[in-house]
């Protein structure tokens, strides 16, 4: 049990931080949050856990309400607090779901969180491999590369207000 508690704490901190790291494009973290919440809600509903399913539907509704004001111009934004809070809600909903429904595979839940976890893992590995501090930001996240590609290839650097939300939609 102590090893499981330590793993849960490590995984929770990692996933919550991952949602903050993908908050580099306007609306991306919100969109990923909505996608993950819908997926978890469906899994919870199929497993018979209607409380978690309904809670996650409410999270989706709140995020969609936020996105109305955030996308495409970014009148308001999540910031660290919002990204951490949403990641926290999702990861603990997943933990509750795994503990309440034995038929729910932890690997299925991990697949739901694939995008933020993979992007964070690749960022840490890339920084370590290049000899850079792993806790320092860089501009090599997949969403940043996609936005720069759209800017350079289609819009030009002076059209970031178009490339930023479009990159979110593409991803």
Model regions and ranges:
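PRPP/pyrophosphate-binding module of the type I phosphoribosyltransferase fold
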Residues: 16-17, 26-29
């Amino acid at each position: 049990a102590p090893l499981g508690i330590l793993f849960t704490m490590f995984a929770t901190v990692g996933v919550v931080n991952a949602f903050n790291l993908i908050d580099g494009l306007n609306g991306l973290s919100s969109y990923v949050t909505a996608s993950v919440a819908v997926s978890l809600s469906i899994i919870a509903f199929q497993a018979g856990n209607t409380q978690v399913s309904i809670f996650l539907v409410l999270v989706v509704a709140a995020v969609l309400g936020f996105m109305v004001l955030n996308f495409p111009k970014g009148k308001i934004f999540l910031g660290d607090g919002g990204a951490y809070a949403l990641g926290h809600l999702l990861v603990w909903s997943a933990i509750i779901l795994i503990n309440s429904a034995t038929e729910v595979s932890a690997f299925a839940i991990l697949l739901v969180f694939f995008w933020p976890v993979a992007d964070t893992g690749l960022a840490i590995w890339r920084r370590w491999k290049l000899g850079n501090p792993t806790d320092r930001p860089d501009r090599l996240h997949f969403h940043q590369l996609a936005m720069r590609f759209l800017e350079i290839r289609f819009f030009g650097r002076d059209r970031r207000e178009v490339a930023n939300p479009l990159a979110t939609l593409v991803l």
